[in-house]
Amino acid sequence: MTRRALLVAAVAVAVAVAFADSSIVVLALPELYARFDTTIEGVAWVITSYNLVLAICALALVLVVHHARANLLLATGTLLFLAASIACALADSIGLLIAARSVQGLGGALLLAGSLPVLGALGGSTARGIAIWTLAGTFGAAVGPALGGALTQLFDWRAIFVFQAPVAGAALLATFGAHVAAILREGWRPSLWRTVPGNVALALLSGALVGTLFLGVLLVIDVFGLTPIQGAAVVSAIPAATLLARPLAAALPAAVAIASGAVLLAAGLVGLAFLPSSDLGYTLASFALCGLGLGLAVPGLTHTVLGGEGGIAPKATLTVGIRHLGLVLALAIGAPLLAGDLVAGADVAKLNATAVIIDGEIPATTKIPLALDIRDELERAPKGEIPDFAAAFEEAGAGTDDAVQQVHDDLVETIERAVTRSFRPSFLFCALLAALALVPILVFGRRWVA
């Protein structure tokens, strides 16, 4: 591999990590919740702070990016990202972690704003730079939860940020090897207004991805009871399908690929909304549909928005800000929606659990103490998590009595079904966002999709 290729790879990986950071800590949230004295809302800010700060800073940078050198933007961003990653790994309180994640968001905005012109310079052309930047960003967004889950399971949550530090360091070194001679004097030109329909579609698709990258991950961990690395294996269907979509996208007209991607993403989210309890095969298929949709729609849409006349730096910065703004707004709506549905789902689960025990073919002398133990376990379990009934059923004789074991199996299945259904409205909300993305794609597509 040539020196130039190594420099391109270093910057591309940094771009992928900056996009992955939107969701990379999702599978680590249970460990963070247990590690720090905080609330569920506090832990959620570990995700929200990064995305919110990145969105705000990227949108603000659109107004000033034409006064800066791309090398300087990239170097400053990677340096901040590097320092913030180390601070995240060393954080000993939830407040410090959220503050460090906010600085990461600022660094990510600068990194992503400067990386595209640098990739164009290193790659030999603007078109090649756009292609590399788009592919890295799409794959990074898709692989985030799986990568974070694997690192959390193999080491602990701090490993997520330890891993990011050398990536940022390599990108920082790469900035000194790129030669972007001119200052990016590319203000808010008319060409930026022509990207509005495409950016609206990207914002809606990014919001829809909340269902896949956040809600779907929480479902397989908290409801299905998978470990972080098992969850990582399941959600790895998303980046795998995203890569598989690449040759298909190349073979289709751009407008067809983008519209098909939005439809497939919506279909995958509808599939997640109607999961038949903890069916991993059905879940994998739904994740794969979402990944195919992501791979077909987002790269083509991003490439279209960034192409054409006008400077790429302002357009890339605007696109980054809009994408993360869509994600933050979807989180702001979807998270409270899910929280309310989980409370209602917990009540339904208790009623259904009572019915299972009453209908069970076991003696009344076993039912009464078992029902009391089950009630206590349900009260103690966090909303959205399936309690561990093993001890209660072991005491009731599940190891030797097939009837008691059958009640246990029926109970777990009933509660899983009730809690899984609690996710349905949130998944359908995200599917609606993907479907709404078809409006700018179909209405304005002929004007800006080649």
Place the predicted regions along the sequence by residue.
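Transmembrane-helix exit segments and adjacent C-terminal regions of multi-pass membrane proteins
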Residues: M1-L7, G207, T365-A450
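Transmembrane-helix bundle of Major Facilitator Superfamily
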Residues: M1-T175
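12-transmembrane solute porter fold
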Residues: R4-L29, F36-Y50, A55-H66, N71-L74, ...
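Hydrophobic alpha-helical transmembrane segments
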Residues: G77-L82, L106-L116, G137-L147, L172-L184, ...
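C-terminal membrane-cytosol helix-exit motif in multi-pass small-molecule transporters
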Residues: A165-E186, A437-G445
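Juxtamembrane transmembrane-helix termini
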Residues: G177-L184, I221, L306-G310, F444-A450
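Short extracytoplasmic/periplasmic juxtamembrane "stem" segments immediately C-terminal to an N-terminal membrane anchor
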Residues: A349-K367
